[in-house]
């Protein structure tokens, strides 16, 4: 996947993930995490987990999936379980757009809070989450099995955005 092309992120389209998206999602996943989810994990989330919703972010030129997210909605809480952007498209606002979409989705599902875990060493993700209103509310000791790194638990409330008057 080449960076850029004619389409910027203004042409970004976010939609529900389908099974046929998994190979492209796996490319993003494998390039993003030291211990990636498996294709069967994504299939399970899509087909068998009633709490899961999965989304992909696509660009038209060159056509392809450049980001994705997996969330669970349980009662009035949405948990972001997995969110990644293809390395060639990072630092271009893609994660911010996807996160804004997810916050709107949470509102539409009647959620009051959104939570996630993030590695303390992932400074870029921490800045993104803090910039979009998340705050650290806890720590899970030795959460990540590959490095035994702790996870920071972050949360934020969700409410309708104010529109201009």
Predicted region positions:
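Acetyl-CoA-dependent GNAT
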Residues: 7, 16-92, 99-105, 109, ...
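Conserved GNAT acetyl-CoA-binding A-motif
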Residues: 106-117, 140
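Conserved SAM-binding loop
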Residues: 14, 91, 117-118, 136
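Residue-level recognition of the GNAT/N-acetyltransferase active site
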Residues: 86, 90, 119-121, 146
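Conserved catalytic-core motifs of GNAT/GCN5-like acyltransferases
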Residues: 117, 130, 135-153
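Terminal substrate-recognition subdomain of acyl/acetyltransferases
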Residues: 1-8, 146-165
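Short glycine/proline-centered loop/turn elements that form peptide/ligand docking sites
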Residues: 99, 121-125, 142-147
